[in-house]
C-alpha cells in the first residue's frame, strides 16, 4: 500500500471513529501509530515517534499560556465578572430597540476579552441574560439565540483557546494571533448589534413575544458609582492583559500570568473564593490543561505521520494542477471547515485539517496570522449549526426553562449564523481587518 493511500485511509478512519464517539486525542494517536507502522513497515519506528512527540510537543515555556488563561477564565466566572458586565450593559442599553440583546452582545464581548472559552460564555449568559430578556417580554427563541450567537466572541476576541491551539499547530506567534483577533471580534459584535436593531425594527415579532418590549417596573436604575464599580474589574483585566500585550510589555505567557493574578485578586476581594472553590477552580484548570496537552501531543504525532506519507505535498501539487487560485482555495477550505463543524467539535477540526491545509496556504503565499483568524471564525460557525452545535447544547443543559427546546435554540441562532458568515466573507476579502493592529503583519 502506498504512503498516500495509507494517509487517505487514516483520514477516513479518523473521521469515522470520532463520529462514533471515540476521544479525539486517542483516535489521533492510534491512527497515526498504525499509519507510521504501515508506511515504514516497522512498529518500533512508530513507538519511537510516539515517545519523541510526547517530549517535543509541549516541552516549552510558551505552553504555559494554556493553563494561565484557562485559570483566568474560571476565576472571572466564579467572581461574577460576566454578570456585572451584563448588568452595566443592561442599564445603558435596555431602552434601545432590542436593547437587552445588544447588552448581551456587549457584555459577551467584554467577557470574551477576559476569558477565551466560548462554552464558558454560553453557560454564564444563559443564567444571567436569558431570564432577564424573558422578563422584559423578549421572544424565548431570540433570547437563547443571541446568547448562543454572541458566545462565539469568546474564541475570537483574545485571549482565545482556539487561537492558542492554532498558534502551536501552525508555529505562529500567539501574541500576534491575539492582536489580529481584536478588530474582527469587534466587527462581529457590531454586526450582531446592528442586526438586532434591524430585527427589532423590521421584524419585531422575531425579537419580542408580542411584537413590543414589556415594561418591568421592578427594575430600578443603579447609581453611576455602582455601575463604575461593577465595570472596574473588567476594565482592569482587559487593560492589564490586552493592554500589556499590545504595548509590548508582556509576552502571551506573561499576559496570561498577569491575568490570572488580577483575576485571583478580584475573586478574593469580592469574597467569592474559599478553599473549596479554589480547589475546584484549580482542578478544572488541570483537567482542561491536561486535555489540551494530550490533544497537542497527539496532533504532533498525526502531523509527522502525514509529513512521512507525503500527503501535504501531494495535495499542493494536485491543487496547483487544477489551477485553483488563493481565493478559490480559501473558499473551498472554509466550506470544508464549516461542514466539519456540523459533525465534530472545534478543536478536532483544527487538529485534523490544519496539518493538511497549512502547506497549501503557504504555497499560495497566504498570511498565516490572517489565515488563523479566518479559520477560527469558520470553525466557530460550527458551534451554532446542527447537529453538533456545542454552544447550543451547553445552553440547553444550563437552561432551567423546559419550554425552550433544542430546536428553538437552533432556530434562534440562525440569524446570528448568517451574520457571522457575512463577517467571515468580509475577513476573506478584506484581510487588513485582522492585520491592521499588527506592528509587523504576519510576524
Give, region by region, the residue ranges found by the protein language model.
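Alpha-helical transmembrane segments of multi-pass membrane transport proteins
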Residues: 1-443
